């Protein structure tokens, strides 16, 4: 049966689409996400059409007023499931409101191909800037924790074995550095997102005299894309964004994994706030780090969305294919998970309880000061490091609290000489065994010494201020573009009945 109200199918297709076909081809969550962006695109395109004399100003005014009403009513009012997608749902509601003679002109010189590509970029841009702001909050939380624990000793690990003494500040600053790089990667990604496909039409552009520079400017883009086929078919920006989010998720997962371990009885370094924990349905004593486990687990989900996007795009010929519809939800879910995970992690860090004494107590377990004892032997005796390494390795077989006599015995076994006769003293050995002395001696760039850590915190805070200024500039530029669009809309609708 023919559906004459379906403005898209009524011309070429005589039969109404089956319900199961409509359900199969629908992309409702992604369409709802794109709804605000589609209205922006419709407004900018309509303003440009009127400016270029392609449609009458009276028709443009009617269209813009109807779009304002649709925006006010919200996404639920357009009844997306009744149409192929949000784009046709909006256009159909528009035509129903103002008639086809006016409303039917809005799509002049435009295809859904360039329309949806533009909408995705606008929505992705908003999420990208939001994720950058979320990362700023997480970095701030990590720096605050580092500031509070500049002198909190703890064991550092390699292979998850006690390795050398460090501080909680030094450890948290490592994570802060990784999330700082994540911010830089996102800032860099904007240049690949912020270019406008609008005006590419189906793929070969259009015979209408469109002003693509104007629509790009009104929508906050840096410039129009200069190949119309690339404009409608390019999804490499999605591959790029999901890749960068996958890296963020890996960094989040590593931090979450540590915090889960540290909250166990075996480590006993931290306790999570009750807000970020759950209990057992059978074991009443349990306090489970479910939230952080989900942060860790969902990193795999985001990596999966990245791989799905790559796998879908890799086999597609230019230009547009409906397979691309399956890529957008991968981006949407990746943003949803990554943004929520970053926010959750920031909250967990802000409310964490650090068990300083337990960290300090375990900072020397596993003979973590062995490296400093070897270094002290080198500095005091002139022996090669590899020789000193062997001497201290002998001591490690016997435990981790050697006296000068113990070091002498091991050195006699190794080289036939006592290191005490070569310049090593009992005081030197005792200082080398002290975990705080170990930390303070590591004062070069990147080390855990107090002054070095304080300098790193200061450097990170300054960098965050610069990043905040960059983010503010990006948002301000976007807001100014939208204000320009609003002014154009008002100038065309004021005084029009």
Curated annotation (Swiss-Prot):
Disulfide bonds: none annotated. GO terms for cellular component: cytosol. Keywords: Amino-acid biosynthesis, Arginine biosynthesis, Cytoplasm, Lyase. GO terms for biological process: arginine biosynthetic process via ornithine; L-arginine biosynthetic process. SUPFAM superfamilies: L-aspartase-like (SSF48557). Its EC number is 4.3.2.1. Pathway: Amino-acid biosynthesis; L-arginine biosynthesis; L-arginine from L-ornithine and carbamoyl phosphate: step 3/3. GO terms for molecular function: argininosuccinate lyase activity. It is found in: Cytoplasm. Pfam families: ASL_C2 (PF14698), Lyase_1 (PF00206). Signal peptide: none annotated. It catalyses: 2-(N(omega)-L-arginino)succinate = fumarate + L-arginine. Its main location: cytoplasm. InterPro entries: Arg_succ_lyase_C, Argininosuccinate_lyase, Fumarase/histidase_N, Fumarate_lyase_fam, Fumarate_lyase_N, L-Aspartase-like. The keyword Cytoplasm applies. Belongs to the lyase 1 family. Argininosuccinate lyase subfamily. This is Argininosuccinate lyase. The lineage of its organism: Archaea, Methanobacteriati, Methanobacteriota, Stenosarchaea group, Methanomicrobia.
